[in-house]
A protein has these predicted regions:
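Cell-envelope/extracellular polymer assembly enzymes that use nucleotide-activated donors
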Residues: 8-10, 38
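Short, acidic, metal-binding catalytic loop of nucleotide-sugar glycosyltransferases
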Residues: 27-36
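Conserved short acidic donor-positioning loop in nucleotide-sugar-dependent glycosyltransferases
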Residues: 29, 44-45, 57, 105
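Short beta-strand/loop segment that forms part of the nucleotide-sugar
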Residues: 36-45, 67-69
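A conserved acidic beta->alpha catalytic loop
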Residues: 43-52, 72, 107
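Conserved donor nucleotide-binding strand/loop of the catalytic core
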Residues: 51-83, 87-95
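Short beta-strand-to-loop acidic/aromatic patch adjacent to the donor-nucleotide binding site
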Residues: 88, 96-108
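Conserved donor NDP-sugar-binding/catalytic core segment of glycosyltransferases
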Residues: 108-138
Length: 138
């Protein structure tokens, strides 16, 4: 077993019009017991307050990088999100990481989420991909 603290992961988050949720996502990533080495947030042309909320939430944090893609308005379900992820992934070329995460910005993670995920990858070398469950509070 390797040290969990030595495990490095990078996160790419395509985001569009998530003003309702993005602040909670930012807080939950900042509160992780094992933080990512880099978090790339790609705003895919939001028309709401998402860019402002992101800017306020991550200002001055050197391991978080944000950028915006302005599109022509045509969105293909799933395809534009993949394109935004690819743009973010290219910005990780200078980053050393063991795992890459695609994280939506409408989720809230418990503080030990990535620590637990990394522990499971460490315990079972055959694991190659992981996903979380969905729980909605009413």
């Amino acid at each position: 077993m390797t040290s969990l603290a030595a495990c490095r992961y990078a996160v790419v988050s395509p985001v569009k019009d998530e003003e309702k949720y993005v602040e909670r996502t930012i807080r939950s990533v900042l509160g992780q017991t094992i933080r990512p080495v880099r978090w790339i947030i790609v705003d895919d042309g939001s028309k709401d307050r998402t860019p402002e909320i992101i800017k306020q939430g991550v200002s001055g944090i050197d391991w978080i990088q944000c950028l915006r893609i302005d599109r022509d308005g045509n969105r293909e379900l799933g395809i534009t999100e993949i394109k935004a992820f690819t743009v973010g992934h290219k910005l990780l070329e200078d980053v050393e990481y063991d795992f890459i995460v695609k994280l939506d910005c409408d989720v809230e993670l418990p503080p030990t989420y990535w620590e637990e995920m990394l522990r499971r990858f460490d315990e079972k070398a055959a694991l190659g991909i992981a996903s979380g469950g969905f729980f909605e509070e009413h």
